[in-house]
């Protein structure tokens, strides 16, 4: 019998490494919406704890969350509007967000498109008074004139060009005369859509006129003071305490002992 290693013998296995739950190394942060909206508690997000050169705040800044206007303003009729919010600052365990865009849900857009009518779209780059460069998309549909017998409501190319020009003028006027906060306040009740519908009555009657999308192309440099103004100017509840300044006490040397 040959003496040597028996390959059939099972090799003793070492102790298995204990699985660690990755969530034990993460912290949860609250997401706060600006004061444009009624319900400011958007939700929560998590991030790895600060460790070494990796700071948790740096990982959170720049995150983009999406919320329905039905949840933000507690109005189910506005569920087709989606608002994007970007995390621009951290205060304690709270993420302070700012407006980053608006869009319609796909089912709402599909419900607007129908036969026998013309769809008119326009987009315009505008700048607010506080330095935000926005791209605003407007959509509209033609409707029947009073006492019209004809089935379709197709607009001529000249009508479409004239309506689109009115859209450009109104969007430019409404955006250039206000800051971002006031512009968002105009988006929610559809002020721009009503202005376009009123201004184009003499060209061709319109219906379902909406600002369907807004993109933030360029934002000014981050400023914590301006961000706090958007959030009401006060410190967010739950933030870390700033601390108390230590008293300036001078050191006094103790008197020497007579004997030890």
Curated annotation (Swiss-Prot):
Subunit structure: Component of the small ribosomal subunit. Mature ribosomes consist of a small (40S) and a large (60S) subunit. The 40S subunit contains about 33 different proteins and 1 molecule of RNA (18S). The 60S subunit contains about 49 different proteins and 3 molecules of RNA (25S, 5.8S and 5S).
Keywords: Acetylation, Cytoplasm, Ribonucleoprotein, Ribosomal protein
Protein name: Small ribosomal subunit protein eS1
InterPro entries noted in UniProt: Ribosomal_eS1, Ribosomal_eS1_CS, Ribosomal_eS1_euk
Superkingdom in the source lineage: Eukaryota
Stored PROSITE patterns: RIBOSOMAL_S3AE
Pfam families, per the entry: Ribosomal_S3Ae
GO biological process, one term: translation
């Amino acid at each position: 019998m040959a003496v040597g290693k028996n390959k059939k013998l099972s090799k003793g296995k070492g102790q298995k490494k204990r699985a660690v739950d990755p969530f034990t190394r993460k912290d949860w942060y609250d997401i706060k919406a600006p004061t444009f909206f009624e319900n400011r508690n958007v939700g929560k997000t998590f991030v790895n704890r600060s460790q070494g050169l990796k700071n948790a705040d740096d990982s959170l800044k720049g995150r983009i969350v999406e919320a329905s206007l039905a949840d933000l303003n507690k109005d189910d009729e506005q569920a087709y509007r989606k608002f994007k919010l970007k995390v621009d600052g951290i205060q304690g365990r709270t993420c302070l967000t700012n407006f980053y865009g608006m869009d319609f849900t796909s089912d709402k857009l599909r419900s607007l498109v129908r036969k026998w009518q013309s769809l008119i779209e326009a987009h315009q780059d505008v700048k607010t008074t506080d330095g935000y460069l926005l791209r605003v998309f407007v959509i509209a549909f033609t409707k029947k004139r009073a006492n019209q017998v004809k089935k379709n409501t197709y607009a001529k190319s000249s009508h479409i060009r004239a309506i689109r020009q009115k859209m450009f003028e109104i969007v430019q006027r409404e955006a250039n005369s206000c800051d971002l906060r006031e512009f968002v306040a105009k988006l929610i009740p559809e002020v721009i859509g009503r202005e376009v519908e009123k201004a184009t009555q003499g060209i061709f009657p319109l219906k379902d006129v909406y600002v369907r999308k807004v993109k933030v192309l360029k934002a000014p440099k981050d400023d914590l003071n301006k961000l706090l103004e958007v959030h009401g100017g006060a410190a967010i509840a739950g933030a870390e305490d700033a601390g108390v300044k230590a008293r300036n006490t001078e050191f006094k040397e103790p008197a020497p002992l007579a004997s030890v």
